[in-house]
């Protein structure tokens, strides 16, 4: 066991983490060059296309060093903020981590968040400066940044190019010499941490585990500690990118895949502990929490008869991703659909894209919202995720909304614009730190509701794509909030309701109705688009009616005849206006996202 090294790679998106993982795999000879597809560790198509790692993957590698055989377990972590819980579980399974920073870009916001998780788990951190082959690489500047922001000594940082293979051998040898072997105790009660789980069509739900203490073997009876359910181990594998390698047992310190013949991933949740029935642990490994949804949106099939197909698709995705929550809801405007909870905005985009791509569904998504805590006058606390569920104003004592701590690293030339944006988003400055004269680190407390709409896009366009951004939830705070309703032709469109700060309600209402005016198709009658708070109309626009020339067939002749026809048309339009229905296009529901 002293020759096992468990390590993971921490990096910001696009800093070359998956490429570096591929280089380490091929250097250890686990895959021949012919079999090497770029990004072996990323298995979902959507991961390769977006260049992001969503699920934590693992691979067991063998390497000979100083005439000794070593086992290297590379545990890949997702780099994106939405998946930080998966990151924390992956890092809890390791003794060390490679901190990969792009030599041309420097330290980014997400890197910092993940490094702090690694430091909390007391991991040995090896700084790795990647992409040194780039013409604009500045190794010394990046070393200074790592020391200044993260406080890790960089005099022994390893410089590599994952693309050309420079420095990879030295990196692997540093992993062996610097990262400690796992502390093991084969006789202690069995404890195995699940740090990833996924669904296989033939084997059912699979759990990727790191054995902390004790050991498990095929045909053992084990217990999943949070559910208290017993299962028999049907098979054990060592993870490998091409085909897993069967094994009869896993000892403490090792990493492997456990097959329990389960139907859903919900039975083996990330962060849970597996223990043996005959050698049972008294308590689980700390830190387990069910993944909590932060951002909610309504998903509706464009063809209403596809509702059951959407339910089946969500059920299947849930097998693989236990963090999604969903429940059926109906909307007067959109029919039947689901209110779906996601870990964050990227997670929402990925899930929507997977539903459309893997299950051939056409979906309308409503504006994303967050959870609000409504304290009622009768003392009751109600939590809502859908603005249309907000109780009447006279029943509300106060409303609390979730806040997040936003960390932003930006070139200093964009600082003024960014501070203006953050102030407009009701942000409160906590910290401002010049890393170098050219780069600034900002910390702000911002309401999550202001971030879920379009904050990320605005941040990127204001800073020409150079700023990086990361956030973590902190607490609920009292806010002066109201519900803004949109009426089209006198009818409330529930899917367009949003909760906004009182001082912004007037301007948001005006922007929304003028955006809607451009989108709502013209009818044969006038259509009023109104924004209201409670019963009070605060903004209005009118979509003019299409004219039909009813007097065209009167040649010359009596003016009263023409007047009679025009009067008749006016009557008809009045009737139509009273009962007319307006079909709203998909863009109308997206217009909510576009307003600032």
UniProtKB/Swiss-Prot annotation:
Residues 2-183 form the tr-type G domain. GTP binds at residues 14-19, 130-133. GO terms for cellular component: plasma membrane. Required for accurate and efficient protein synthesis under certain stress conditions. May act as a fidelity factor of the translation reaction, by catalyzing a one-codon backward translocation of tRNAs on improperly translocated ribosomes. Back-translocation proceeds from a post-translocation (POST) complex to a pre-translocation (PRE) complex, thus giving elongation factor G a second chance to translocate the tRNAs correctly. Binds to ribosomes in a GTP-dependent manner. It is an enzyme of class 3 (hydrolase). GO terms for molecular function: GTP binding; GTPase activity; ribosome binding; translation elongation factor activity. This is Elongation factor 4. It holds the Pfam family GTP_EFTU_D2. The lineage of its organism: Bacteria, Pseudomonadati, Campylobacterota, Epsilonproteobacteria, Campylobacterales. Its main location: membrane. Keywords: Cell inner membrane, Cell membrane, GTP-binding, Hydrolase, Membrane, Nucleotide-binding, Protein biosynthesis. SUPFAM superfamilies: EF-G C-terminal domain-like (SSF54980), P-loop containing nucleoside triphosphate hydrolases (SSF52540), Translation proteins (SSF50447).
């Amino acid at each position: 066991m002293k020759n096992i090294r468990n390590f993971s790679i921490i990096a910001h998106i696009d800093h070359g983490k998956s490429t570096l993982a591929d280089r380490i795999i091929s250097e250890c000879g686990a895959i021949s060059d012919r079999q090497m597809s770029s990004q072996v560790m990323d298995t979902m198509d959507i991961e390769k296309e977006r260049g992001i790692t969503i699920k934590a993957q693992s691979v067991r590698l063998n390497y000979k060093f100083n005439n000794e055989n070593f086992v290297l377990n590379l545990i890949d972590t997702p780099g994106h903020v939405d998946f930080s819980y998966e990151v924390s579980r992956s890092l809890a399974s390791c003794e060390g981590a490679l901190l990969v920073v792009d030599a041309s870009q420097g330290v980014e916001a997400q890197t910092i968040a993940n490094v702090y998780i690694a430091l909390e788990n007391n991991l040995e951190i090896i700084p790795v400066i990647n992409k040194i082959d780039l013409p604009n690489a500045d190794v010394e500047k990046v070393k200074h940044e790592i020391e200044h922001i993260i406080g890790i000594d960089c005099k022994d940082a390893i410089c590599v190019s994952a693309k050309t293979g420079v420095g990879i051998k030295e990196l692997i040898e540093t992993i062996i010499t610097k990262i400690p072997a796992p502390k093991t105790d084969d006789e202690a009660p069995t404890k195995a941490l699940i740090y990833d789980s996924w669904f296989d069509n033939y084997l059912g739900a699979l759990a990727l585990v790191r054995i902390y203490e004790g050991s498990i073997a095929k045909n053992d009876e084990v217990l999943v500690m949070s559910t208290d359910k017993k299962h028999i181990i049907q098979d054990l594998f060592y993870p490998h990118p091409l085909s897993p390698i069967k094994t009869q047992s896993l000892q403490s310190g090792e990493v492997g895949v456990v097959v329990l013949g389960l139907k859903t991933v919900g039975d083996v949740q990330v962060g849970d502990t597996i223990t043996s029935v005959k050698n049972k642990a008294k308590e689980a490994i700390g830190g387990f929490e069910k993944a909590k949804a932060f951002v909610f949106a309504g998903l509706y099939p464009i063809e209403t008869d596809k509702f059951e197909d959407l339910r089946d698709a969500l059920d299947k995705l849930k097998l693989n991703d236990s963090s999604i929550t969903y429940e059926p809801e109906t909307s007067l405007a959109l029919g039947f659909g689901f209110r779906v909870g996601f870990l964050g905005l990227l997670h929402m985009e990925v899930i929507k894209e997977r539903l459309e791509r893997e299950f051939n569904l056409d979906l309308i998504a409503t504006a994303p919202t967050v959870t609000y805590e409504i304290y009622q006058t009768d003392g009751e606390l109600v939590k809502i995720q859908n603005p249309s569920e907000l109780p009447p104003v006279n029943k509300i004592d106060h409303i609390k909304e979730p806040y997040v701590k936003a960390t932003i690293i930006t070139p200093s030339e964009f600082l003024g614009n960014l501070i203006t944006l953050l102030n407009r988003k009701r942000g409160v400055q906590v910290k401002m730190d010049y890393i170098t004269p050219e780069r600034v680190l900002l910390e702000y407390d911002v309401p999550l509701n202001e971030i879920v709409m379009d904050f990320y896009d605005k941040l990127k366009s204001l800073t020409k794509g150079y700023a990086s951004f990361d956030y973590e939830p902190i607490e609920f705070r009292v806010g002066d909030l109201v519900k803004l309703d949109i009426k089209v032709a006198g009818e409330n469109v529930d899917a367009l309701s949003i909760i906004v700060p009182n001082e912004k309600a007037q301007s948001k209402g005006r922007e929304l109705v003028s955006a809607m005016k451009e989108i709502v198709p013209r009818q044969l009658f006038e259509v009023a688009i109104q924004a209201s708070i409670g019963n009070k109309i605060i903004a209005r626009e009118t979509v003019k009616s299409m004219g039909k020339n009813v007097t065209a067939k009167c040649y010359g002749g009596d003016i009263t005849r023409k007047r009679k026809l025009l009067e008749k048309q006016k009557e008809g339009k009045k009737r139509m206006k009273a009962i007319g229905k307006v079909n709203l296009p998909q863009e109308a529901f997206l217009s909510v996202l576009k307003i600032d």
